[in-house]
Amino acid sequence: MFGRAPKKSDNTKYYEVLGVSKNATPEDLKKAYRKAAIKNHPDKGGDPEKFKEIGQAYEVLNDPEKREIYDQYGEEGLKEGMGGGGGVHDPFDIFQSFFGGGGFGGGGSSRGRRQRRGEDVVHPLKVSLEDLYNGTSKKLSLSRNVLCTKCKGKGSKSGASMNCASCQGSGMKVSIRQLGPGMIQQMQHPCNECKGTGEMISDKDRCPQCKGEKVVQQKKVLEVHVEKGMQNGQKITFPGEADEAPDTVTGDIVFVLQQKEHPKFKRKGDDLFYEHSLSLTEALCGFQFVLTHLDNRQLLIKSNPGEVIKPDQFKGINDEGMPMYQRPFMRGKLYIHFSVDFPDSLTPDQCKALESVLPSRNASRLTDMEIDECEETTMHDVNIEEEMRRKQHQQAQEAYDEDDEGHGGAQRVQCAQQ
């Protein structure tokens, strides 16, 4: 972060917590921490807050860079450089890294090393509407990291590792830059030597199978079951199948369903919508057609005798929609949306034939005198949606231009005064 160099504040507290002088050597700090940590460990009836304070003091004073900041600026300097609480790790993790996994006398701590949770791995899974209607299974081959079986995830032949000398086993480094008089920049970043692990393994001791990486790649085939009625965006989870890592609870592999567009059917919840066009003759005189459903069943769709279908009319069929998720014997509705195709023009004879069977035209006819008093107009075809979009864009542009003319000058003058 960037900021003013913090004022000097109390820089003796951490030394007092460990019971050492300000000139204490790293060996003095280790001895003091060992004694204080064992005495105050919660598993031995100690005070958790005191134990946390001891771990915090040791982590700061055992790191040469953090200790330098603390000696110069106290806790305030650490907070400004590392955000809030000084970037301190879990006190139990510090204890475990110091004493190893055995805890007290090999019996192990009841709390143990706190494991972090690994990241979930998310994959999109494309499915058709037919897949969601009928249900399906898909086999997918994936590569993932698993703990090396030869070294059991230790990375070494002996199963041992050393704390990184560069970062004192914390995995993090703090760098300080002087930007100018009274201005400093402090940044925390992963240690370059150990790549943030806090551990180092000698070349001779590296595991020959994983080369010290602790994990190896494994190919695995997962069978994903897509159940009837599942939705676009729904997740299918395989717990604990993501990448493995030491001291880490393995995350999940998550498949997110992505439904492909269907040319005829649209889905809304548990209902299906189907578009169908009728000729004017069919709309007026009746129709029938075969609808091929998502499971390839053939449905006969026909109008009732004497029924007239209007443009944009909907008809519904019960229990022919989507299966309901985890209730596959219950289904939504199938709605058919009708559009009517009108002829582009009619001959005079066709008009007379239609007039003979259709309701007569409006009885009120205009006289020649009334027509002479009117102004003639010419109609043209329009795409109403495109027209509305164009008008909205034009109105928005005019409003923007008006606002710029009304306030732009005053704002520029104000900025000039500042």
UniProtKB/Swiss-Prot annotation:
Residues 382-418 are annotated as: Disordered. The keyword Zinc-finger applies. The modification Cysteine methyl ester is found at C415. It comes from the Eukaryota. It is a lipid-anchor. Residues 416-418 form a propeptide. GO terms for molecular function: ATP binding; Hsp70 protein binding; unfolded protein binding; zinc ion binding. The keyword DNA repair does not apply. Keywords: Chaperone, Lipoprotein, Membrane, Metal-binding, Methylation, Prenylation, Repeat, Zinc, Zinc-finger. A zinc finger (CR-type) spans 135-219. One of its GO terms (cellular component) is endoplasmic reticulum. It is found in: Membrane. Its main location: membrane. Pfam families: DnaJ (PF00226), DnaJ_C (PF01556), DnaJ_CXXCXGXG (PF00684). Residues 11-76 form the J domain. HAMAP family: DnaJ. Plays a continuous role in plant development probably in the structural organization of compartments. This is DnaJ protein homolog 2. The lineage of its organism: Eukaryota, Viridiplantae, Streptophyta, Embryophyta, Tracheophyta. The gene is LDJ2.
